[in-house]
């Protein structure tokens, strides 16, 4: 039987509970999942890559079929081919996400027609949540409870101690 391997990518700057919900749900659908931290060339990162990887790895520690990977200046579809991924996993919060993902899927399919894209719709609880909003809350030192995993809260507290 074919092993189903998924790749869920994002900048995870920082990882949110919405991201974790997608991973949790996908982990039951796939034999193995790679969670890939990619830099978005159109955005300046708030957290350094190694910090994002540490927060994400800690947040996903209980998942036995999930591996965190990073990539610099490469297309996710190229990394997917290298990892022998069978499916790309994408989370959709709203129509704007869908339009973006629809365009991305078109090009991914051109580059790797054998890799399918699977979309998981965000639960209502997480549809308004984004890393951008979390960064805004961090800037104003607002509570992050119920929005991000403890690894992110601990990192933010550590950063606040230094200032």
From Swiss-Prot:
Catalytic activities: (R)-4'-phosphopantetheine + ATP + H(+) = 3'-dephospho-CoA + diphosphate
Residues given in the record as substrate binding sites: 11, 43, 76, 90
Name of this protein: Phosphopantetheine adenylyltransferase
Pfam families from the UniProt entry: CTP_transf_like
Protein's pathway: Cofactor biosynthesis; coenzyme A biosynthesis; CoA from (R)-pantothenate: step 4/5
Localization per Swiss-Prot or TrEMBL: Cytoplasm
GO CC annotations on file: cytoplasm
Binding site for ATP: 11-12, 19, 91-93, 101, 126-132
Enzyme class: transferase
Subunit record text: Homohexamer.
Domain of life: Bacteria
Single GO term (MF): ATP binding
The keyword Nucleotidyltransferase is annotated on this UniProt entry: yes
Species annotation: Streptococcus pyogenes serotype M2 (strain MGAS10270)
